[in-house]
Amino acid sequence: MKLQISNCKKAAVQDGMIGLFFEDINYAADGGLYAEMIENRSFSFVDCYGDVGDYYTKPAWGYGWNATKECGEGRLEYVTGSPISRVNPWYLRFTAQDAGQGFWNKAYDGIYLEKGKTYTVRFYARAAQYPEGDITVQVTKDGRICAQAEVSCIHAPEKTWQKWNLYEAVLEAGETIRNGRFTISLTKPGTVEFDLISMMPDDAVAGVFRKDLFDLLKGLHPGFLRFPGGCIIEGNTLENRYRWKESVGDIKDRRTNFNRWAVHLTSEENGWHTQYSHYNQTLGIGFYEYFLLCELIGAKPLPVLNVGLACQFQSYELVEMDEPEFQEFLQDAVDLIEFANGPVDSTWGSVRAKMGHPEPFGLTMVGIGNEQWQTEKIDFFGRYQAFEKAIHAKYPEIKLIGSAGPDITSERYDKAWEFYNCLLYTSDAADDL
């Protein structure tokens, strides 16, 4: 069979022009590509409410965690004072009145285990008020134990009670299950404090990415990967925006941030509060991991930067270009390029190297703004020019990707093309090529 679409020669598509866009929306990162199986692992989630110009959060430190009831209920308290990191200051103090009492995690609607595969559990704990006994880690399904490990507890004396110890256990799945329950319990009565409880499949790619989803992305052979968004770059408010510098370094020092999509579709009818109100970002996939993902799937990285604007659909907030704070946004752009490409003795290149990648990532382009457009009150074009000047003063080789707004049929779209001085090929003009 011969299929002829047209006998007119069209414009060739440049190699690398077809790629992927990744954003933590619909649990694409936390609960998705990020292989972490525990939800709210640092006891730092918040519950999100509100509407345009009036967003707010309430503490939900214990979201996803509950006491088990098989041996009577222990007591869960969420406290602060001497955490493993001041960035995420809350942690769990669990008291068992009787042996076998414990707590379980929601785990993004349940643990999935595949028979024969192994999973590594890590957590920080301290046990100054747990003079004897150990810690049991399990995954259960309908009362059946599907994977289990015993962890020997370090019984620290009272004078060293502030010292956190890192524990590790390997679980081997005895059967394949869905919607399993992750539990931790104490073998004796006592009090133990926990923080940063993690469970990862041992086949996670680079120890970060869920293998099945990673393989699907790689199989698409994308020319580029645009990340980390999307509207989460902008945030519902500038306080909620994505700050790339908070997404690099040690996992325990990455500040949990509520997800912009946690307040999507709020309305008076639902009390400005939806079923996704606890959607938070752990930043377990941060900018280092995004660059690493690009390298592993053979795609060019295309990071997108905030230009001092919160989401134009969801907020009126901005930083004026003549305010000193605007320089922070420009500096973040310049520093990002140093993080990706800079030598190991540079400020941000050294951060990359310490994370395990002394070689540069080979960044060649950055996105200036997400779905921004020009208005009477917002001079996006002026912001673009400010970023262009700041970036090209130090890195003239970097290509910049602008924004033409969120649609292709409006005046704001046409104005953007006029600004970028690009030739707009209409369908009629394309026929003549």
Give the role of each language-model region.
Residues E23-I25, G229-I232, N306-G308, I368-E371, ...:
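Active-site beta-loop-alpha junctions enriched in small/polar residues
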Residues L3-I5, L76, V208-D212, I285-E289, ...:
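Alpha-helical scaffolding within the catalytic cores
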Residues M1-T282, K300, L318-Q327, K377-I378, ...:
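Extracellular and organelle-lumenal recognition/adhesion modules and their flexible linkers in secreted
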Residues V205-A206, N280-Q281, C311, V344-T347, ...:
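Acidic-and-aromatic substrate-binding clefts and catalytic sites of carbohydrate-active enzymes
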Residues G229, Q312, V344-K377:
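Active-site groove signature of glycoside hydrolases
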Residues R352-A353, H392-E411:
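Aromatic-lined carbohydrate-recognition surfaces of secreted/lumenal glycan-active proteins
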Residues Y425-D432:
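Conserved small/polar residues in nucleotide/adenosyl-binding loops
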Residues C294, E320-G342:
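Acidic, His- and aromatic-enriched active-site or binding-groove loops in soluble protein domains
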